[in-house]
């Protein structure tokens, strides 16, 4: 770390944010931490580096499209791989070492990005960038302090690297898991998953039977519009409830066209009104106004929902990280699973018809929410900056245990 960064105070920090754009959550987490640092006056400069933009085209295409095809057509295989690879890095040798070397070669242009030479802190919100940067840190190729922000409830071993100066995880349970995976307890903090600071300012609008306000159901199609959204919406339009259903289609133009066609065909006096949005940057307002959210159990979207105390109906979790997220949320009492799309409407109707149940779910979501996680991470980045770089001895220990 540059000496002037310490002498000049926290406001002189240059921070590089690294991720890989597979889905929207990883990038949203980077932006949330950036905005919190900026709000606290800790940024002198910021650079966002998208790893796949600095990789060969064949690799970037395979990485993005291959994963999306796999979760769509072979989710059980994805889950099996997730479970079998959730072991400490030292237990993945020698195959793991070969894959590490291949990854370093493929991402050579990313590793050589000029932004790293002047950075005081590097923040990684994707496990691939964490692995590459962690190895750079251990070799002495990265002088900046390295912070990993895990964007899932469960810190799978691919997120855990002893080259990191700080690993931020979702909860105390996640911290225990990270420590069991070989991370120094002094280098892992239970901060929560960072979300847009706007969620700190969003107050939920409570629904109670007997009020004139029509309850609102938010259907989140996700940044890619994945999932059986059309079936879910039709199940709610056919359900015995009075509600406004707002479906967010993300960047899926085909889904948006289909939803608008359904909405235009609805009679004006239908008990369930359908409203359609494409990609939106006001999810914090929509979630605060909603009474129930229906969507996939992604780490960022469910964290945002909990920040405003929004009960969730979770659609067919993908085996692996989504399954872990869903189990945690259902266990808290903040969510219900809908493993079949056609059941979503009856589940939502049942929640809205039972005010006591709805209130319990809202309270459970709110109690487990950490809307200020991004600010907590910013505080820890500031403390890390004041402490300076890890000692040579620390780096040697990290190299031995990786």
Question: What would you call each of these model-derived segments?
Answer:
Residues 29, 85-182, 187:
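Active-site and donor-binding regions of nucleotide-sugar-utilizing enzymes
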Residues 32-113:
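Conserved N-terminal ligand/cofactor-binding loop architecture of enzyme catalytic domains
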Residues 187, 194-209:
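Acidic anion/phosphate-binding donor-loop and adjacent secondary structure
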Residues 203, 210-290, 323:
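Donor-nucleotide binding loops and adjacent catalytic segments primarily
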Residues 277-278, 335-341:
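Short acidic-hydrophobic, aromatic-tinged amphipathic segments that line or gate anion-handling sites
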Residues 283-324:
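A donor-sugar binding/catalytic signature common to diverse glycosyltransferases
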Residues 331-332, 340-357:
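C-terminal "capping" alpha-helix adjacent to the active site of nucleotide-linked donor transferases
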Residues 356-402:
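C-terminal amphipathic helix plus adjacent low-complexity
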């Amino acid at each position: 770390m540059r000496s002037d960064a310490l002498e000049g105070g926290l406001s002189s920090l240059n921070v590089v944010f690294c991720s890989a754009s597979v889905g929207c959550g990883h990038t949203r987490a980077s932006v949330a931490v950036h905005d919190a640092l900026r709000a606290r006056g800790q940024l002198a400069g910021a650079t966002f580096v998208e790893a796949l933009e600095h990789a060969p085209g064949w690799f970037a295409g395979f990485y993005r499209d291959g994963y999306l095809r796999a979760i769509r057509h072979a989710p059980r295989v994805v889950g099996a791989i997730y479970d079998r690879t959730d072991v400490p890095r030292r237990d993945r040798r020698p195959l793991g070492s070969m894959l590490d070397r291949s990854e370093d070669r493929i991402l050579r242009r990313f590793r050589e990005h000029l932004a790293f030479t002047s950075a005081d802190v590097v923040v990684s919100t994707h496990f691939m960038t964490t692995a590459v940067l962690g190895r750079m840190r251990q070799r002495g190729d990265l002088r900046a302090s390295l912070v990993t922000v895990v964007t899932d409830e469960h810190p799978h071993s691919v997120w855990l690297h002893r080259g990191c100066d700080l690993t931020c995880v979702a909860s105390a349970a996640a911290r225990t898991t990270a420590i069991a995976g070989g991370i120094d307890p002094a280098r892992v903090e239970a901060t929560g998953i960072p979300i847009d600071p706007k969620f700190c300012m969003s107050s939920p609008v409570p629904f109670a039977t007997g009020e004139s306000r029509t309850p609102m159901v938010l259907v989140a199609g996700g940044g890619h519009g994945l999932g059986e959204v059309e079936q879910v919406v039709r199940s709610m339009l056919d359900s015995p409830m009075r509600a406004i259903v707002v479906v967010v289609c993300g960047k899926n133009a085909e889904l948006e066209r289909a939803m608008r066609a359904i909405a235009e065909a609805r009679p004006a006096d239908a008990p369930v009104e359908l409203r359609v949005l494409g990609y939106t940057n006001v999810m914090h307002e929509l979630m605060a106004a909603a009474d129930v959210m229906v969507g996939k159990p992604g780490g960022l979207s469910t964290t945002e929902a909990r920040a405003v105390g929004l009960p969730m109906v979770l659609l067919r979790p993908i085996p692996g990280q989504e399954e872990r997220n869903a189990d945690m949320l259902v266990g808290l009492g903040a969510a219900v699973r809908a493993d079949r799309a056609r059941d979503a409407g009856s589940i939502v109707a049942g929640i809205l018809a039972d005010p006591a149940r709805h209130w319990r779910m809202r309270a459970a979501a709110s109690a487990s929410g950490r809307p200020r996680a991004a600010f907590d991470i910013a505080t820890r980045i500031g403390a890390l900056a004041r402490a300076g770089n890890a000692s040579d001895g620390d780096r040697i220990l990290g190299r031995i245990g990786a």
